[in-house]
């Protein structure tokens, strides 16, 4: 469980209080500039706490050292780039400790490449992959740490529709063994895949809770200035238009 108490970050976040349950796929949503990335980076410990606290179960983030943060949290930034000439195997290996024996390294990489369906790509140069293939490999790199919490910033933004769905399916498959928190703009995919939503409006918490309760007509109008057709039975949001 992640508990956020009275979290304030400069001009980006203002007195955020919420609890994110363990083992769920949780979407962080809001218009551009609402504070989604800032919230993720603060939970990850990348941005220092200015005011308030983030708790992982009963452990405060402010008391965790770099090793403890790495053990608890895996973070995948938006548009993460690999600039070196590495194979897919080498990229996934970046998520492992350098001191891990080679035999264990090979075993773990084989297991996680199978999990994310990239085994056939292991010897291929990472830079030659498609955007969707790169996304899978990057997710495997993060998940191979086996941290209980995975934070992902806008993972589907650069992907085509097939790989957008694929990425959400991959994240969903990690629950309930892991808690996955993802910043996401895509309303219909968030509505379909996320268990819960944290909805931000101009740095403030507008709503938090089960997806169908949060992504209702009133909240969509407040957060995004749009109207849409919502079908809770089919888990779809369609016919989105400006107010």
Go through each PLM region and give its residues.
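Conserved ABC ATPase signature
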Residues: 125-129, 133
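Conserved ABC ATPase "signature" region
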Residues: 106-121
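Conserved ABC transporter NBD signature motif
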Residues: 52-60, 69
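The feature captures the beta-strand-to-loop junction immediately N-terminal to the Walker
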Residues: 29-31
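Catalytic Walker B motif of ABC-type/P-loop ATPase nucleotide-binding domains
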Residues: 150-154
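Helix-to-loop junction immediately C-terminal to a conserved catalytic motif
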Residues: 44
């Amino acid at each position: 469980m992640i508990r956020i108490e009275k979290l304030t970050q400069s001009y980006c976040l203002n007195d955020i209080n919420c609890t994110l349950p363990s083992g769920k796929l949780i979407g962080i949503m809001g218009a551009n500039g609402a504070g989604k990335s800032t919230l993720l980076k603060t939970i990850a410990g990348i941005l220092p706490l200015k005011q308030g606290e983030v708790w992982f179960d009963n452990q405060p983030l402010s008391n965790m050292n770099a090793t403890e943060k790495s053990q608890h949290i895996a973070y995948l930034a938006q548009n993460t780039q690999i600039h070196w000439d590495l194979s897919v195997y080498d990229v996934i290996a970046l998520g492992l400790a350098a001191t891990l024996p080679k035999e264990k390294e090979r075993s773990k990489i084989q297991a996680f490449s199978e999990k994310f369906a990239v085994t056939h790509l292991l010897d291929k140069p990472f830079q030659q992959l498609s955007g969707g293939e790169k996304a899978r490999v990057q997710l495997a790199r993060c998940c191979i740490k086996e941290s209980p919490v995975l934070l992902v910033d806008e993972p589907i933004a650069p992907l085509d529709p097939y790989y957008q769905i694929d990425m959400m399916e991959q994240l969903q498959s990690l629950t309930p063994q892991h808690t996955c928190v993802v910043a996401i703009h895509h309303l219909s995919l968030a509505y379909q895949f996320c268990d819960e939503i944290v909805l931000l409006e101009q740095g403030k918490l507008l709503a938090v809770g089960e997806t169908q309760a949060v992504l209702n007509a009133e909240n969509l109008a407040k957060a995004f200035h749009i109207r849409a057709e919502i079908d809770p039975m089919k888990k779809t949001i369609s016919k989105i238009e400006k107010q």
